[in-house]
């Protein structure tokens, strides 16, 4: 079973993430940031990852620490669940549309953290959610999952649609990358023999 649970406590946030990479998309989300819960739901459902996230943060100041630290903790949990990476496909990509919006996400479980985030948001907030926090979420994730991640919103007018297509595509790309390949069972997906 490729499951993991990570607890991260700081003076700003207390976060618990539990996941099963071979799940069915079940989720239990309580971050204190409703729009983040909505986006995490997209990852779970489209990634077919069973996901529990519980967070308590200093949201009386703003949502920054909570969103960033959830990304960090999710990255740690994914890295733990993937383990030595033997037999995974390593790469994943997905294009996802939602009405006028279209996003592409490409991921590589390379062991080298890197983020290219290109989303020309059409407004600064989605409800009360600051769209810049999505960058902090993904930066936290890549730095702690050890992945290279390219995110491009190719078109979109509605900022909610722009970000929702990003998270849906991320879930689907993640699912593809961590999928086990029977033909490569027990093998590290690299000519170097390590990742």
Swiss-Prot record:
Pfam families given for it?
Answer: IGPD
Quote one Gene Ontology molecular function term. imidazoleglycerol-phosphate dehydratase activity
Q: What is its EC number?
A: 4.2.1.19
Q: What is the top-level taxon of the source organism? A: Bacteria
Q: Where in the cell is it found?
A: Cytoplasm
Q: Which CDD domains match?
A: IGPD
Classification via Gene3D superfamilies? Imidazole glycerol phosphate dehydratase, domain 1
Query: What does the record give as its pathway?
Result: Amino-acid biosynthesis; L-histidine biosynthesis; L-histidine from 5-phospho-alpha-D-ribose 1-diphosphate: step 6/9
Swiss-Prot/TrEMBL keywords: Amino-acid biosynthesis, Cytoplasm, Histidine biosynthesis, Lyase
Please state the span of the N-terminal signal peptide per the UniProt entry. none
Query: Has keyword Cytoplasm?
Result: yes
Catalytic activity, as annotated:
D-erythro-1-(imidazol-4-yl)glycerol 3-phosphate = 3-(imidazol-4-yl)-2-oxopropyl phosphate + H2O
What's one GO BP annotation on this UniProt entry? L-histidine biosynthetic process
Primary site of residence: cytoplasm
Assigned protein family: Belongs to the imidazoleglycerol-phosphate dehydratase family.
HAMAP family for this protein? HisB
Protein name per its UniProtKB record: Imidazoleglycerol-phosphate dehydratase
Q: Which gene encodes it?
A: hisB
């Amino acid at each position: 079973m490729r499951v993991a649970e990570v607890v991260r406590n700081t003076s700003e946030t207390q976060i618990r993430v539990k996941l099963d990479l071979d799940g069915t998309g079940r989720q239990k989300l309580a971050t204190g940031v409703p729009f983040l819960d909505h986006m995490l739901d997209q990852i779970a459902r489209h990634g077919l990852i069973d996901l529990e996230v519980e967070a308590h943060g200093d949201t009386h100041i703003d949502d920054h620490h909570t969103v960033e630290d959830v990304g960090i903790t999710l990255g740690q949990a994914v890295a733990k669940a993937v383990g030595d990476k033997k037999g995974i496909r390593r790469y994943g990509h997905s294009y996802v549309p939602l009405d006028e919006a279209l996003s592409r996400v490409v991921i590589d479980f390379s062991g080298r953290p890197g983020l290219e985030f290109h989303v020309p948001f059409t407004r600064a907030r989605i409800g009360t959610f600051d769209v810049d926090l999505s960058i902090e979420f993904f930066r936290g994730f890549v730095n702690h999952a050890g992945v290279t991640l390219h995110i491009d919103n190719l078109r979109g007018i509605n900022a909610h649609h722009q970000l929702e297509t990003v998270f849906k595509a991320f879930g689907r790309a993640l699912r593809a990358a961590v999928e086990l390949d029977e033909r490569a069972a027990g093998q590290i997906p690299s000519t170097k023999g390590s990742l």
